[in-house]
Amino acid sequence: MASKEMFEDTVEERVINEEYKIWKKNTPFLYDLVMTHALQWPSLTVQWLPEVTKPEGKDYALHWLVLGTHTSDEQNHLVVARVHIPNDDAQFDASHCDSEKGEFGGFGSVTGKIECEIKINHEGEVNRARYMPQNPHIIATKTPSSDVLVFDYTKHPAKPDPSGECNPDLRLRGHQKEGYGLSWNSNLSGHLLSASDDHTVCLWDINAGPKEGKIVDAKAIFTGHSAVVEDVAWHLLHESLFGSVADDQKLMIWDTRSNTTSKPSHLVDAHTAEVNCLSFNPYSEFILATGSADKTVALWDLRNLKLKLHTFESHKDEIFQVHWSPHNETILASSGTDRRLNVWDLSKIGEEQSAEDAEDGPPELLFIHGGHTAKISDFSWNPNEPWVICSVSEDNIMQIWQMAENIYNDEESDVTTPELEGQGS
């Protein structure tokens, strides 16, 4: 039996390598930017910070990322990294593509273009790290313990204390187990939600300040789910509404003004397997998306949750991340275990397709990013550069990429480059 499994693993590895070679060959036609960087340790989390600076006379802008580490029994860190991204008018062409690393966009190699600026000691791996929108210096993290930690990275030395001591500015208590979901309220400063394997969602107000030492107790604990709560998200336009999704296959919508924390305002059987993630549309009061172990992304309207608006199908395995574009109301992306990051366009749902096109996926599947050869752990849309995404995978690889403009810009004719090899997912 073991030898059969080993054989299957080897075959899968070969297929993955073959697909990666094809992807690399095609990058000049499919992307306007690809930067590949091997991190010292894999990061389970990634988020662009909102700040950007444009050094005078340079053909690049400086952006920052929040990352974490997942080491093998070595000291873990919360990391802020600085990234050089070339300006649109930077002089480069696809012939400069470094075919060895599959990188281009003005960069033969990314050495020195992505650097860790701040490293802060962390207790165990960083399951997730998210900055507070009202003050991006404040970052909350999920740990392998039940505590949620809060750091103000301006109050920590750029180089971590060699003793390895983790010294968060606040320690948020309320959970019994670890988890992944984490969401800051963009309308109420300091209000943080967290989802946990203990079946609950905790809410803290960090402005309340610690009761003793640095410990802040949960302001409320929501207990509606009957299994691991995978993700939680505040509504982006209503300060008191949030959603949670769990292994009980349910999506729950909560209102913090309600006098009960054991029963959500709305409950829907969202998928036929665990629900791993959710995302509210930043432009719409009513639209949200959920991603599931059933390999689909579902689209919902808060006005009628009994009816699923649409199901996005193309992923070959569990979906763990779904995020709407910060720049386009109809664009969202999803990723997970199948090593693919899919970008979807709602405005193309129901468009007619040739039989040949239909083989590649439904009309709303705008793009498949095939650059990762391991499970994607997290991704983030750049808030300052439309269509730029940073994705991180379990094999230490971080990619910063932007699909070619002619793919999302319909006015131009479609790519009909004869050199383009089969990009099957």
Curated annotation (Swiss-Prot):
GO terms for cellular component: ESC/E(Z) complex; nucleus; NuRD complex. Core histone-binding subunit that may target chromatin remodeling factors, histone acetyltransferases and histone deacetylases to their histone substrates in a manner that is regulated by nucleosomal DNA. Component of several complexes which regulate chromatin metabolism. There is a cross-link at K4 (Glycyl lysine isopeptide (Lys-Gly) (interchain with G-Cter in ubiquitin)). GO terms for molecular function: histone binding. There is a cross-link at K4, K101, K155, K159 (Glycyl lysine isopeptide (Lys-Gly) (interchain with G-Cter in SUMO2)). InterPro entries: G-protein_beta_WD-40_rep, Histone-bd_RBBP4-like_N, WD40/YVTN_repeat-like_dom_sf, WD40_repeat_CS, WD40_repeat_dom_sf, WD40_rpt, WD_repeat_RBAP46/RBAP48/MSI1. This is Histone-binding protein RBBP7. The modification N6-acetyllysine is found at K4, K119, K159. The gene is RBBP7. GO terms for biological process: cellular heat acclimation; chromatin remodeling; DNA replication; negative regulation of cell growth; regulation of DNA-templated transcription. WD repeats lie at residues 47-122, 128-173, 181-217, 228-269, 275-312, 318-369, 376-403. It holds the Pfam family CAF1C_H4-bd. The modification N-acetylalanine is found at A2. The modification Phosphothreonine is found at T10. Its main location: nucleus. Binds directly to helix 1 of the histone fold of histone H4, a region that is not accessible when H4 is in chromatin. Subunit of the type B histone acetyltransferase (HAT) complex, composed of RBBP7 and HAT1. Subunit of the core histone deacetylase (HDAC) complex, which is composed of HDAC1, HDAC2, RBBP4 and RBBP7. The core HDAC complex associates with SIN3A, ARID4B/SAP180, SAP18, SAP30, SAP130, SUDS3/SAP45 and possibly ARID4A/RBP1 and ING1 to form the SIN3 HDAC complex. It is found in: Nucleus. Belongs to the WD repeat RBAP46/RBAP48/MSI1 family. Keywords: Acetylation, Chaperone, Chromatin regulator, DNA replication, Isopeptide bond, Nucleus, Phosphoprotein, Repeat, Repressor, Transcription, Transcription regulation, Ubl conjugation, WD repeat.
